[in-house]
Amino acid sequence: MAAEQYYGTGRRKTATARVFISVGTGKVTINDRPLDEYFGREVARMIVCQPLEATDNVEKFDIKATVKGGGSFGQAGAIRHGLTRALMAYDEAMRSTLRAAGYVTRDAREVERKKVGLRKARKKPQFSKR
């Protein structure tokens, strides 16, 4: 396999991604499937490739990711976060560019739990005055 590979763990909502990058031709594999096949929506594919575009490394690295949990956009965000960390492991000079783009910070927004006595997390039952 690759002589030197760099690793990053990414998380978003309930999705967790393990991302390995190695110098190559720009091949992206997610759960042993190509990027186009794994993500049907173009927006999800764009989210995954954003760190590469921000650092002008689109066809410089081969990416192999395994991702579990969450939906398609949560998984795409987790891969983006892991890819960002892997790129920083490869070259620490990329950190400032990636931070300016907002990819270094983990998006901490999670689903709020449903509370007892309410219909959803915050939706209350209809109020009747009389």
Curated annotation (Swiss-Prot):
One of its GO terms (biological process) is translation. The keyword Hydrolase does not apply. InterPro entries: Ribosomal_Su5_D2-typ_SF (IPR020568), Ribosomal_uS9 (IPR000754), Ribosomal_uS9_bac/plastid (IPR023035), Ribosomal_uS9_CS (IPR020574), Ribsml_uS5_D2-typ_fold_subgr (IPR014721). Signal peptide: none annotated. It holds the Pfam family Ribosomal_S9. GO terms for cellular component: cytosolic small ribosomal subunit. One of its GO terms (molecular function) is structural constituent of ribosome. Keywords: Ribonucleoprotein, Ribosomal protein. It comes from the Bacteria. Belongs to the universal ribosomal protein uS9 family. NCBIfam families: PRK00132.1. This is Small ribosomal subunit protein uS9. It comes from Teredinibacter turnerae (strain ATCC 39867 / T7901).
